[in-house]
Amino acid sequence: MLSVENGLDPRAAIQVIKKKLVGSVKALQKQHVSLDTVVTSEDGDANTMCSALEAVFIHGLHAKYIRAEAGGKRKKHTHQKPLPQPVFWPLLKAVTHKHIISDLEHLVFINTDVGRCRAWLRLALNDGLMECYLKLLLQEPARLCEYYQPTALLRDAEEAEFLLSFLQGLTSLSFELSYKSAILNEWTLTPLSLSGLCPLSELDPLTVSGAELQRKESLDSISHSSGSEDIEVQHSGHKIRRDRKLTASSLSLDTASSSQLSCSLNSDSCLLQENGPKSPDHSEEPMSYDSDLGTANADDSDRSLQEVLSEFSKAQVNSAPSSGPSQESDTPMFQTPLSLHSLANSTHLLFEGSEEPFPAHTSSGTSSGHKHQPQESPDMQPLGTAQAGPAGSTSDQQPSSPVAGAADQGSEPWKALEYGRVGPKLVVSSPTSPKGKSWISEDDFCRPPKEHALKNTSDLCISPLQGTPELRTALHGPFSQGPRKSCSLGALDKACVSSLDYRNAQTAPSPAVTQDHKNFCVVHRRQMGLSNPFRGLMKLGTVARRGAMGIWKEFFCELSPLELRLYLSDEERTCVESCSLLRCEAVGPAHSDGRFELVFSGKKLALRASSQDEAEDWLDRVREALQKVRPQQEEEWVNIQYPDQAEDSPEAPPDNLPPYSALLPEHAGAQGIQPNWTSAQVPEPDAIKESLLYLYADRTWIPYIFSLSLESLKCFRVRNNEKMLSDSHGVETIRDILPDTSLGGPAFFKIITAKAVLKLQAKNTEEAAHWRDLVRKVLASYLESVQEAVTLAGSLDENCQEVLKFATRENGFLLQYLVAIPTEKGLDSQGCFCAGCSRQIGFSFVRPKLCAFSGLYYCDFCHQDDASVIPARIIHNWDLTKRPVCRQALKFLAQIRAQPLINLQLVNASLYEHVERMHLIGRSREQLKLLGDYLGLCRSGALKELSKRLSHRNYLLESPHKFSVADLQQIAEGVYEGFLKALIEFASQHVYHCDLCTQRGFICQICHHQDIIFPFEFDTTVRCAECRTVFHQSCQAVVRKGCPRCARRRKYQEQNTVS
């Protein structure tokens, strides 16, 4: 297998893929769910997630589906091995609709099967169908065997189940990923390394050798404009390789803002343009080195940053057009403003002005030797213009530029770099410095908005650094820590300021640095003077949780800024519960005994700490996490004042936001008609909330009156001043309700049901928030009533509840009818709609059919007269008749058929007394349980044989009162008694003939006969209820003096008391 040949075990590759996938999805949820923003290809975490998903499909692929690279940029470097190109497009076509296949195969810039595979994955994420596609693939094991080896991730049942459950977290995200880019035509290094086809060492950013540098020039770092342009750079420094070729991709750093670099290089004619068509979506594919796989030390960072500025300054001088002095003075080289926001994520540049002129260094790298004319007035120089000085000229003709600084993050030390005696002072905060004394993380800083940052730097006068003898060509970004914490080269290429005084940089801090230090404000978190040993964890410890039956059980609890996790113990890292803080609705008070409650959407956690103080500390940390994970109100933030932009600025900042009306999508703002929110209709009698909302349907917004009750959400159309029922959604079909600002603003939200997603618009933000709050409360009330209907009846224990939640995700509302006879409410209560598909039934429509299991009405498609016994009618009425049920109920009964969900002793114990057959069955079940105790202690292996005969119903040996739907069906058919008798006969014969089991029998202490008797012999023996000793039934009836053993024990106790 290729992964083994490359030194990576297939199982280890799976863990690497899972770690990458989990980390990227959690980062996306943290960044986008609370703000309801759309995930695009500009997000580094989104590209990391795509790479991990691509690695899922590549892992374990058969060798015949992996071919060598047919072309690409790695072919330019003959000393490198070509990247393998795995192809699984025929497998994807088997589960994809023909229209989608046709669209992907007719994309203009996607012309390879590799490109179609990668485009298919991104399109599936955009459509929210990734989980659905994966389910379809896993249902076809024959195809998976054809394409994948036995050790592949997709052929591992447990790993595939984990992947399915984890992909459900993507439902809270909206994707708009680019899938039409020509970059997708070839595999990048990241998914191949994660899947094991390439060594993981190729992703290591610490290597600074030339070969490793060229390996970084993969498609991971190519954008729209920098895909194929090369810059011929010839340096005179003795440490420069003269045959070195600088490409735009090699000049890039790990950044999610690659389009800034490509646009700045392309628009200013710094690169040679390539002929031929360009992909319109290239700019949407960010550049990534995946540098989170390693961390560089400070020295490597210093060297790499120095090389970045030096090498790029050379590229500016040598690649400038040489058409004459007039062209040099009229054509600005760089006009994109400096973005401090991108710089502040990973590096901090400090430019310090000079009062003393010094001679500028000349560059020998110019190709034509033209001398540039100095500007007559430095004030007339356009903002952001890069200008090269003449050979031998002095820099006193240009004044020093204002200082632009960036604030230190946290309390990490500053490190200064310098270029000989001249050049900018580059300051880098070490990303892994252990000297920080604060618990405050990067997310606790409130950075200024981008437009303010641009205003603060609009007065910079930029000019390139001219050659220095210490330049080298190595170019890396080892100081970057992931795609989001990256340094934009679009800012670094303009960070070359002339007339800098190195001595002033060491003596006096710049005023801009002081100002930027004041601009950063800490909004929350504790400062304890010590470094946080558990980075990312806010609190951990042991708490007790109250179960369904009121029993407290201890768990090891971890609180992170995003979720609360419960483990079995601190050693056994088995997660039994994970609650997202995004769904936390209320935090209860701490009681004197340490009890406190956390209320989430659909469930409530009852927890208990060791003391009240400990409980209050838990609540404080939860509130702190909630404040951090949820967006705060605008009035709570500190207003940061910035100097106004100069009036003579040649251009306005490019990041000025358009008016709010321009941000509205076409379907929300292009109507041209103002919504009418007036409604004079009488509310429904059972309505909790009823108001006018606009529903998005058929590419337009239509007004409807929505009425919410404890049982359903009804939708009415107003015609002739009368309400006409248009649709009805049962509360049991509602999955979630979420804000959706992407539709046009905070007044928009969506309701996710089992049948459709309702996109709605309320009158204002408060009205939308009120609707979301009420729907969540109604849904929580319904789920609580369903749980009480079964749990309080004693039919479910905690283990069965977990199994049931997994098995009945879609039909969980039918659980309430398992032990309770349904009440028929009539067709009018359903609004004349089918309870399964919302099709209109009754009257002149389809004839309604009653489901005997749920008491609801269905159409002829959802109800096809399938017959089944009704468990609730057997339990309460001993009604063994088969009745017609809907297909939904039949599927539900099949899903839970083998689960022991009914405890007859708690639901209806009188059934044993009133029904003779149930009395005999209960007697046989007790015998079987006692025999199971004997076989469980025997070492002969008889228990395994008995388990085979049980047909996986091991609960028969655990409790005599637990029954499943399969047991009730066999009781109705009359075969259950024979099944139990066969089991009792087998087990009793073993006990009678086993030497070990017979030694655990009893001798009657009344007659002292040598015959061994057993407690499961109900016909001839009787057992003392107190000491559990077994006697002959005839001997006990004759003596009538009670249990001799109990009498002796009481006598001994009296003697001990007297003595």
UniProtKB/Swiss-Prot annotation:
Residues covered by region (Interaction with RAB7A): 657-1059
Boundaries of every PH domain copy: 536-627, 686-780
GO terms for cellular component: autolysosome; autolysosome membrane; late endosome membrane; lysosome
Expression across tissues: Expressed in testis, skeletal muscle, lung, liver, spleen, brain, heart, kidney and bone. Weakly expressed in monocytes (at protein level).
SUPFAM superfamilies, per database record: PH domain-like, RUN domain-like
Disordered as annotated region, ranges: 218-244, 272-334, 354-411
Highest taxon of source: Eukaryota
GO BP term, pick one: positive regulation of ruffle assembly
Pfam families named among the record's database cross-references: RH_dom (PF13901), RUN (PF02759)
Domain notes: The LIR (LC3-interacting region) motif mediates the interaction with ATG8 family proteins GABARAP, GABARAPL, GABARAPL2, and LC3A/B/C.
Protein name as annotated: Pleckstrin homology domain-containing family M member 1
Organism the protein comes from: Rattus norvegicus (Rat)
Classification of source organism: Eukaryota, Metazoa, Chordata, Craniata, Vertebrata
Gene responsible for this protein: Plekhm1
